[in-house]
Amino acid sequence: MVKFKQTSEVLKIMGNIEQIRNIGITAHVDHGKTTLSDTLLSAAGLISEKIAGQALALDYLDVEQKRQMTVKAANASLYHEYKGKPYLINLIDTPGHVDFQSKTIRALRVIDGAIVVVDAVEGVMTQTEMYLRVALEERVRPVLFINKIDRLIKELRLSPTEIQQRLVQIVRDVNTLIATYADKEFQKAWLLDPMKGQVAFGSARDRWGLTIPLVQQKGIKFSDIVDVYTRGKEAVAELQKTAPLHEAILDMVVKHIPNPREAQRYRIPKIWHGDPNHEIVKYLMEADPNGPLVMLINDIRVDPHAGLVATGRIYSGTLRPGEEVWLVNARVPQRVLQVSLYMGPYRELADEITAGNIAAALGLEKARSGETVVSMKYKDTMTPFEKLKMITESVVTVAIEPKNPQQTTKLIDALYKLHLEDPSLIVKINEETGEYLLSGVGTLHIEIALTLLKDLYGLEVVTSPPVIVYRETIRDRSQVFEGKSPNKHNKFYISVTPLNEETLRLLSEGIIMEDMDARERAKILREQAGWDADEARRIMAIDENLNILIDMTTGVQYLREVKDTIIQGFRLAMREGPLAMEPVRGVKVVLHDAVIHEDPAHRGPAQIFPAVRNAIFAGFLTARPTILEPILKLDIRSPMEYIGNISSVITKKRGKLIEVQQMETTARVIAEIPVSESFDIADMLRNVTAGKAIWGQEFSRWAPVPENMLMDLIAKIRTRKGLKPEPPKPEDFLSP
């Protein structure tokens, strides 16, 4: 068993930061990420060579093996020797499918380099671009692997010259993205130069790979590779020996991806926005193993035997069992019970793991992904790492119940665990019907969650057909309305206004947040979104669906005592709007004045909540309310002759073509369609292009539903929720 020998060697190298690399593999779905990971794992001796490529060692969930796609981001530590020196490479495999983006984005936070895998036939696709963009925003340095060269030879029958032209084009496309999205100081430095060995090409399935320096060193020509495939299997096996894939890739990683200390010097200012003069900064910038512990959790797993396993990167200090640590976001102390490193799907115990490494900890039961863990000494002064920007939203929902009603408690527990592991799976209980609602990024996301319920927890469930999650908003400003509490002793005077596009952008990109410095926030809103100085200073709350509550009152007695209750009332009103009980988005709620009863017994939540809600809803219904629907962006590649057919499918689906680009042999269509029209789009595109189209999709934006469909849609949503079809009128919320 190589593995045991390896664990001891791996632990030895962990203490030497120059010999560590933290990398991820990102790509569009099906471009060959997991096959590449397997080859790397087999070379590092974690699974036998015979089954690498078929083993899909990192795809260790049954679901992943069956569907041939990665659902979770898995970790493994690899061992590689370069120029006689041993290196430890922490590898994170990430899903390529758009429905699992949140996992990929969380993985990008803890790595310093990304191997971008591109299929030589399909070229750069939507998810390639999207993940590369996020990687560059996180200051993760890319290198490139152009995969499936065998397809260029066997399927497209390209000549050696044409193969080279295709590779040059892909490198050019990736470099264009780097020049577009990288921070200014890295735009030139990070451009990929094949001559320096920053681009590898090969076949992950056939397990061979080369870089230009290796080609020159081994004296291999493109015509030799074409020749190998004409000679058959034995020649391919020979090529595996002459040009093993792991050698090309891992050499490229060691040479061109920075070690954790080098990377943290330029990544910390980007991902951690604490006080630059805080003494902890010097430890973070140097990844100092003797400094205080600072760890960022990027992944939570529920192990049936061990309980909650929190995996993350140690940015400073050393993680040891028995130590008490502080969770900055959860604001609780926890004791680390066990520390381990990953080897494929297995955790190997360690006495300690030092800065720069990826580690797994048991005992941090209250940790969630995105949590910052710090030594107790800094519990009051540590700023958490920046929140991760998620590109997608969970917009598809199913109602779910166990086939066997006695398993309800088991279902609640299982759903809670699934949400822990994947925070973009959202679980809610419908108070009216008692149903459990599960929301995900797309239908596939939900299907996989249901399969996991069955496979991991033995739960058979019944689900409703998928429904789309909408948002409610307004298009005009309302006048001020009075909301009275049921006992008539408290009154709130409130108006509502739509937030402008610039404010929504600042909120959705996480530039403006509820818990940031109020002066800095006011300055950004004034300068970038044209806010009035007074309003910008007086923000009381910002909720998760991008609504803002502002306090413009002066001298109202007892307001401070009920401030938290008012904020709760605002949040509740925004959670379910008046039109169809869907979440509200993009509304500024202004409190102008209030009358509050002096006796606390008469101003509890049961009085304040309805008063605040009624004033907001009355204003909302007079301000040209509407429903927003989620829109998908499609990126379709297809032979030129099918463009007409594709265009008519898009139009039929209430979509619109944004651009059509002609490429060498194919056309690229960028289009948008509503999520509600997308459930059968895959079959339709296949039918009209004789199966020759390939496409990717991502969440694009929220857009108002066409006016001629609005009332009908509101009635449908309300009926589905067991409400009467007509929405309420403003008068329904105004007390006489």
Swiss-Prot record:
Keywords: Cytoplasm, Elongation factor, GTP-binding, Nucleotide-binding, Protein biosynthesis. GO terms for cellular component: cytosol; ribonucleoprotein complex. It is found in: Cytoplasm. SMART domains: EFG_C, EFG_IV. GO terms for molecular function: GTP binding; GTPase activity; translation elongation factor activity. It comes from the Archaea. The modification Diphthamide is found at residue 602. PROSITE patterns: G_TR_2. Pfam families: EFG_C, EFG_III, EFG_IV, GTP_EFTU, GTP_EFTU_D2. SUPFAM superfamilies: EF-G C-terminal domain-like (SSF54980), P-loop containing nucleoside triphosphate hydrolases (SSF52540), Ribosomal protein S5 domain 2-like (SSF54211), Translation proteins (SSF50447). Residues 18-261 form the tr-type G domain. GTP binds at residues 27-34, 93-97, 147-150. Belongs to the TRAFAC class translation factor GTPase superfamily. Classic translation factor GTPase family. EF-G/EF-2 subfamily. Catalyzes the GTP-dependent ribosomal translocation step during translation elongation. During this step, the ribosome changes from the pre-translocational (PRE) to the post-translocational (POST) state as the newly formed A-site-bound peptidyl-tRNA and P-site-bound deacylated tRNA move to the P and E sites, respectively. Catalyzes the coordinated movement of the two tRNA molecules, the mRNA and conformational changes in the ribosome. NCBIfam families: aEF-2, small_GTP. This is Elongation factor 2. It comes from Desulfurococcus amylolyticus (strain DSM 18924 / JCM 16383 / VKM B-2413 / 1221n). The gene is fusA.
